[in-house]
Amino acid sequence: MKINRKYFVTLLLVLVVLTGQAQVNPTTALLGSWSGKLKVGIMSLTLVLHLEQADGYVAVTLDSPDQGAKGIAAYKEFLSDDSLAVKVESIGMTYRARLKDGQLDGTFAQNGTTIPLVLTRGVPEVKRPQTPQEPFPYENEEVTFYNEADSATLAGTLTWPMGYDKKTKPAVVLLVTGSGQQNRDEELFGHKPFLVIADFLARQGIATLRYDDRATGKSVGGEVKNATTADFMRDAAAGLAYLRSRKAFGNVGILGHSEGGSIAFMLGAQKKADFIVSLAGPGVKGDSLLVAQSNLIMMLSGALPTMSVEKYREQEAVKQSPWIQWFIDYDPSADIRQTCCPVFALNGDHDCQVIASQNLTAIRRLLLPSKKNLVKEYPALNHLFQHCTSGLPTEYGQIEETISPEVLQDIAQWINNLKQ
């Protein structure tokens, strides 16, 4: 959702750019990369400090991989062979440390709060064991389709099922990402959930089409700055129309994650999909969803939940974002009620962005009665359907798992059962 997977508690990193290089002795022992965990309550943020020499100067930059932030320039206050002090002035942050037993033993400070922070040499290895590796036992086809109404050409990957036979017509699923422009793999923090889903479904006899969002990757054209969910829905509608035009498939369905779940129900109400998989899709009006999201994240982060619908609307009105203004006014109830095709709606009970108790409950109540519908809540899964501890977005990049194997199996089994 429009936490955009970037609504992280501002302990450290707003994307700022400060100039600041230190002219130092080029033999300093602290050159290189240092990393560690900043722990605040139940939260833990990975920080990486880079000290790189160039032309007699040392450039100091910070990364916060768990927040998707890299290359943030820091100002050097002091640097020697055994100690340093760096500052990011615009957010009131400093880090002072001394070399001790091969580690930087120091203190992180921001706006009056001080926290011990130990950094060790090197950058932590990012492990993503579920990311599929070639060779694949199935065919991938690069395709494009066109949304004429918005002059957008969408580029994507059509993945055929393993052992595909032209005499058969397998089910096919269009994969639609959440909010914010993303590539066809819905990539974030090194995770590629849509690639993992496409690979798994191909091995279970199901085809998929995943595509780069408009003006992202190889997709070109289409308004982005002033676009709303309704505009992105037309991109997905063009994808469904393209799949039907191939005349190679049986059921043509749509799997939407987060905002993509809203798009799935919008198209379901228009009877353009044969089935829907809603991964953490909204079930309530946008302003209610985002207020609940904000309050839960504040509470889990140790702050008092103080957001109200009125306060949220006042804050967002100042930003004048067409996307957010459309979203906070959008109530999915009518689209969900008018969706007649089979629906599999799922959420994790640790989802902090689209809260299961609020949204999945609403979807269950609004769906038309059908034995083919399935509504399921998974224990200990977050918004990305990873097994997690708190569910906070700051955990997404720290977790090696991309998506729960149980979720993958349930999606494939449910789609395949529709043929019976």
Regions found by a protein language model. Give the residues of each.
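Central antiparallel beta-sheet cores of small beta-barrel/beta-sandwich binding domains
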Residues: 24-100, 105-113, 130, 138, ...
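Accessory cap/linker subdomain of secreted extracellular hydrolases
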Residues: 266-267, 271-338, 353, 369
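Short beta-strand element of the alpha/beta-hydrolase
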Residues: 168-179
